[in-house]
C-alpha cells in the first residue's frame, strides 16, 4: 500500500514532465497499462517506457497538470490529470482523464485510464 508521500512523489515526477522516468521509477517490472478498458498494454515496465517515449517523440510539448488531489484507498489510487499536447503535426488538444492504479507496495502494478476519446478527436 503506497503512502501519501509516495503517491505525491510519483505525481511530482509526472507533473515535471518526466513521464518515462516516472514509469522507470514507480512501476513494477511486470506492470501493464490499459486505455478505456481496451486490451491491456503488456510487456512490462521497459515496454511501457518505450511506448511512452514514442508518444512523447510525436509531440513538441506536453503540459501535465494535476486537476484534483489523489484518492488513496489501500492499494488503489485514483488520480485526475489534464494533459495538453502540442503535436509536431496537427492541432494542440487537451485531455482530462482519471488514472485508476493498483499498487503493490511502493510501485504501480496496473493502471487503467478513463477518458472521453472525443478529446483526442476520436
Residue ranges of each PLM-predicted region?
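Terminal "cap-and-tail" regions of soluble proteins that handle hydrophobic small molecules
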Residues: 1-16, 25, 29, 46, ...
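A solvent-exposed, acidic/Ser-Thr-rich amphipathic alpha-helical stretch
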Residues: 2-5, 20-75
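Alpha-helix C-capping/helix-to-loop hinge sites
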Residues: 10-13, 34, 62, 85
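Short coil/turn residues that cap or connect secondary-structure elements
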Residues: 15-18, 89
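A beta-strand edge to alpha-helix "cap/lid" segment located at domain peripheries
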Residues: 49-122
Amino acid at each position: 500500500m503506497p503512502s501519501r508521500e509516495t503517491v505525491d512523489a510519483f505525481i511530482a515526477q509526472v507533473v515535471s514532465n518526466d513521464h518515462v522516468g516516472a514509469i522507470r521509477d514507480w512501476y513494477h517490472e511486470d506492470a501493464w497499462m490499459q486505455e478505456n478498458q481496451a486490451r491491456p498494454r503488456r510487456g512490462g515496465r521497459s515496454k511501457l517506457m518505450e511506448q511512452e517515449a514514442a508518444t512523447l517523440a510525436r509531440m513538441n510539448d506536453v503540459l501535465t497538470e494535476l486537476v484534483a488531489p489523489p484518492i488513496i484507498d489501500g492499494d488503489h489510487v485514483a488520480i485526475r490529470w489534464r494533459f495538453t499536447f502540442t503535436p509536431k503535426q496537427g492541432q494542440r488538444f487537451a485531455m482530462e482523464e482519471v488514472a485508476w492504479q493498483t499498487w503493490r507496495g511502493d510501485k504501480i502494478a496496473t493502471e487503467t485510464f478513463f477518458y472521453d476519446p472525443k478529446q483526442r478527436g476520436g
